Amino acid sequence: MESQQLSQHSPISHGSACASVTSKEVQTTQDPLDISASKTEECEKVSTQANSQQPTTPLSSAVPENHHHASPQAAQVPLPQNGPYPQQRMMNTQQANISGWPVYGHPSLMPYPPYQMSPMYAPPGAQSQFTQYPQYVGTHLNTPSPESGNSFPDSSSAKSNMTSTNQHVRPPPILTSPNDFLNWVKIYIKFLQNSNLGDIIPTATRKAVRQMTDDELTFLCHTFQLFAPSQFLPPWVKDILSVDYTDIMKILSKSINKMQSDTQEVNDITTLATLHYNGSTPADAFEAEVTNILDRLNNNGIPINNKVACQFIMRGLSGEYKFLRYARHRCIHMTVADLFSDIHSMYEEQQESKRNKSTHRRSPSDEKKDSRTYTNTTKPKSITRNSQKPNNSQSRTARAHNVSTFNNSPGPDNDLIRGSTTEPIQLKNTHDLHLRPGTY
């Protein structure tokens, strides 16, 4: 009875004391409940002495619940050991989801060895580590940071088999909108080039010079997920990452193609808005140029309807073709094909008119010759007038006398004139007629 009362009033300390006494004094297989009263009093004294020397232990002690079968030693629970990689190089789940990436297969859960070519980048851990990547939007990436507290070690002194940078590289800004992704990729590619990784990036004209190493791939994954949070990625980027979350190079290649496409779209729209045609070039060439522009814009997701396209074309017409602006002004259902049909018709008329003018055109020298000389087709003989002009100083009577004397004088010329006249109008100078000079 006394032993039962003792066990009810002091369950933990009495158990501990009994355990120590049993381990030292009781060496038989006798049941501990069948002990004498003297032994019970001795246990009570020892228990009182133990309580005065040891502090009260919590309920989560290593003593088992069965006080009758107490173990001679308290169990020691070993502390959790680190994984195969150092603890400071791993991220927990909460830290890995700072940028919104999925937990499974996250690049930050990969072991991150110190990347020698860019030593300022360590694996993203706590939120405080983001302070070493300030945002400098609109500035050059290779410009040193204005913050004096962020000083990075010189990577040129690092001895490694990888290429090291010779300058401090400024990180790209953090992406904040899906619409700015292509602009962000331009800065990110510049950042990789400044980090001596330009030879692993494909360009518009050539492929990558070499393949990246495992360390470089790890660096690419960490920097991409750090500066491009998943909630701000375009849908086509998320589709690529859903297949392979480490295929950053495919994202960069497709982004470069989209940049070229955007540049071509801007050039096509500019060309379409500044069209000019006056008939100096063939209508077929003009139609082919405009049709190719409209097809490229349509394939790139920028369709232009007939009404807008016709407005662009008519705005660029000049000269005689300007008339088509007013001829087609009130046509509601006008198409590009109809407008080019009118341009072709006007161009053919213009070319036909030029050909007709070239056949009927005569040179000014030929017209001058026709006005001065002629050919006598009825008579083989030609009459040539005397080019000698009479002397104006002589009187009219003297000049008439000279003419009459010239006509009466025999000579071959005078006979020629007589023979050439007709019979009814023969003139005889028998009455001494005085004719005025220049009347024959």
Swiss-Prot record:
Coiled coil: none annotated. The keyword Cytoplasm applies. Induction: Ty1-MR1 is a weakly expressed element. Induced under amino acid starvation conditions by GCN4. It comes from the Eukaryota. Keywords: Cytoplasm, RNA-binding, Transposable element. InterPro entries: TYA (IPR015820). The record marks H401, N402 as: Cleavage. Residues 363-372 have a biased composition (Basic and acidic residues). It is found in: Cytoplasm. Residues 1-88, 137-174, 350-424 are annotated as: Disordered. Residues 299-401 are annotated as: RNA-binding. One of its GO terms (cellular component) is cytoplasm. One of its GO terms (biological process) is viral translational frameshifting. GO terms for molecular function: RNA binding. Residues 1-31, 46-60, 137-168, 373-411 have a biased composition (Polar residues). The keyword Phosphoprotein does not apply. Capsid protein (CA) is the structural component of the virus-like particle (VLP), forming the shell that encapsulates the retrotransposons dimeric RNA genome. The particles are assembled from trimer-clustered units and there are holes in the capsid shells that allow for the diffusion of macromolecules. CA also has nucleocapsid-like chaperone activity, promoting primer tRNA(i)-Met annealing to the multipartite primer-binding site (PBS), dimerization of Ty1 RNA and initiation of reverse transcription. The C-terminal RNA-binding region of CA is sufficient for all its nucleocapsid-like chaperone activities. Homotrimer. Retrotransposons are mobile genetic entities that are able to replicate via an RNA intermediate and a reverse transcription step. In contrast to retroviruses, retrotransposons are non-infectious, lack an envelope and remain intracellular. Ty1 retrotransposons belong to the copia elements (pseudoviridae). This is Transposon Ty1-MR1 Gag polyprotein. It comes from Saccharomyces cerevisiae (strain ATCC 204508 / S288c).
